[in-house]
A protein has these predicted regions:
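Core dinuclear metal-dependent hydrolase active-site scaffold
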Residues: 2-63, 130-136
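Active-site neighborhood of divalent metal-dependent phosphoester bond hydrolases
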Residues: 1-2, 107
Length: 136
């Protein structure tokens, strides 16, 4: 096990697998430890997945969205409908959007939230369940 601090940029690039880190504003910057929350892109076999991590919002992960096949977006701190609409209107929408790390909005009414997500034009958004597999 090789544990190390990370910073923005490519943190792994071997055997056709590339992982890029980008700090988020979720926990801010600490003078001793630097950025304490990160989002990541994972690229392999011509596919790209972006994981927001705990995020302060769109501006935190937007630089990772180019050619994104699947964006895994946390909803513990964000409204999924607002996030889907913003992404659809941004001109940088991923091919697919999967919501994870669910907050109260989704936990209270997952079917209702999914029904509302289905009405957002310009993006394919789904609420994902723990343990669910998504093929790219």
């Amino acid at each position: 096990l090789d544990v190390r601090d990370i910073a923005d940029g490519v943190i792994y690039d071997e055997d056709g697998l590339r992982v890029t880190a980008l700090h988020t504003s979720h926990m801010g910057h600490d003078a001793q430890y630097g950025w304490r929350a990160f989002g990541f892109s994972v690229e392999a076999d011509g596919k790209k997945l972006v994981y927001t991590g705990d995020t302060g919002g769109y501006d935190d992960y937007a630089p990772l969205l180019e050619n994104c096949d699947l964006l895994l977006h946390e909803t513990g701190h964000h409204d999924p409908l607002a996030a889907a609409r913003h992404l659809a209107e941004s001109g940088r929408a991923p091919k697919r959007l999967g919501f994870i790390h669910h907050g109260r909005t989704i936990l209270a009414d997952p079917e209702g939230v999914q029904a509302r997500l289905n009405t957002v034009d310009g993006i394919s958004a789904r609420i994902l369940n723990d343990g669910e597999t998504v093929e790219l």
